Amino acid sequence: MIRVSIIGATGYTGIELVRLLANHPEVELSSLVSRNASNKPLSDIYPQFIGRIDLKFSEYDCQAICQNSDIVFTALPHGISQEIVGELYNCGVKIIDLSGDFRYKDSAIYEKWYRENHHYPHLLEKAVYGLVEINRNSIKRSSLVANPGCYPTASLLGLWPVISENLINLNTIIIDAKSGVSGAGKGLKRGSHFVEVDENIKGYSIGSHRHTSEIEEIIKTFSGNQKAIVSFTPHLVPMKRGILATIYVKLKQSISERALRELYHKYYPDHGFIKVLPRDIFPETKYVVGTNYCYIGLKYDTRTERLVIISAIDNLVKGAAGQAIQNMNVMFNLPEYMGLKQVGVFP
C-alpha cells in the first residue's frame, strides 16, 4: 500500500483528494494536515466520512510525515506551499504540489505573475509539470510533480494536438473560460458570497490572470521553445464545479474538420481520460462533474477560418485532485485509471 499524507486537507482541493483516495485500492491515508482543524476528527468537519475514515487532522510535522509517507500531496496556497515542499524534498519523500509554486522553470516569471519571492529556485529544474497526457515519461521518473492549474489543464488539453503538429499560429490563441465558484477556493471573500454569485456572470483578472503565463510557458516548453501569445479571459459563473473553455485559433494551412478530428483521436485514444466528441456534439460541464475526464469538441468555422475548440473539466478533479492522483499512479507504475473511474453525476 502507498502511504499518503495530505497537507491542506480541509480546503476544497484537499478534501477532494480525501474523497477520491478513500476509494483507491492501493492507498492508505497516513495523515491529514490542517492548521485550523488540528486534533479534530475528519468526520466532525466533513460528516460524509463517518464510518469511512477514522483519522484526525494534525499539525504539520515534517519529520513525522517523512517517516510515515511514501508520497505527500500539498494542497496549499502559493507562497506557503514552497516552504513546505522545500523541507519535504530534503527528506526524500515523493511530492505532488497543487499550488502554482513549481510550475515554472524560471523563477523570474513566477515572481512577476505571482508577486511572490521564490525561495527554492533550485527545485524548479527538478520539478516536472504534471499534465500526464503530454509529459507521462518525465512524471514516471520524478519525485516532485507540479500539478497544473485548472484553467491551463482545460486549455492545454484542448490545444495540444494542433500545437504538437505545428498547425496553428501561436500568437492567435484566444481562450474564453468559465469556472464554477469552487475554483476561487474556500476562503471567505465577497465575490464568492451566494448573493454576489447567484444569477450573475462576471469576468475577472482581465489580461492579468496568472494562468495566462502558465499556459504560455508550457506551450513554449513543449513546442521547441516557440513563443506563444495567449489572450485569456476567465469568468465566474453561478455553479459549484466545472470549467468550460472555448478556444479560438488560426490554422497555418487549410485542413478539413474530419482530418482534425482524426488527429485528436490519434493523440487521445479512446481508453484515456480525454474524450473527443463526434461532429456537432460539444462538451457540457454536466458531462464531467465529479470525474477525471476532459471532454473536447471541435468546429472549423470556414467563414472566419478559425478552429474553435471547446473543452470541459471538473475543476476540482481533472483540474486539481483527480489529476494529482493520476500523477501519483504514474509515479508508482499503477494503472492511470486506478481510483479514478467515476462516471459524471447527472443531473
Curated annotation (Swiss-Prot):
It catalyses: N-acetyl-L-glutamate 5-semialdehyde + phosphate + NADP(+) = N-acetyl-L-glutamyl 5-phosphate + NADPH + H(+). GO terms for cellular component: cytoplasm. The active site is at C150. It holds the Pfam family Semialdhyde_dhC_1. GO terms for molecular function: N-acetyl-gamma-glutamyl-phosphate reductase activity; NAD binding; NADP+ binding. Keywords: Amino-acid biosynthesis, Arginine biosynthesis, Cytoplasm, NADP, Oxidoreductase. PROSITE patterns: ARGC (PS01224). One of its GO terms (biological process) is L-arginine biosynthetic process. It is found in: Cytoplasm. Its EC number is 1.2.1.38. InterPro entries: AGPR_AS (IPR023013), AGPR_type-1 (IPR000706), NAD(P)-bd_dom_sf (IPR036291), NAGSA_dehydrogenase (IPR050085), Semialdehyde_DH_NAD-bd (IPR000534). Pathway: Amino-acid biosynthesis; L-arginine biosynthesis; N(2)-acetyl-L-ornithine from L-glutamate: step 3/4. It is an enzyme of class 1 (oxidoreductase). Catalyzes the NADPH-dependent reduction of N-acetyl-5-glutamyl phosphate to yield N-acetyl-L-glutamate 5-semialdehyde. Belongs to the NAGSA dehydrogenase family. Type 1 subfamily. This is N-acetyl-gamma-glutamyl-phosphate reductase. It comes from Halothermothrix orenii (strain H 168 / OCM 544 / DSM 9562). The lineage of its organism: Bacteria, Bacillati, Bacillota, Clostridia, Halanaerobiales. The gene is argC.
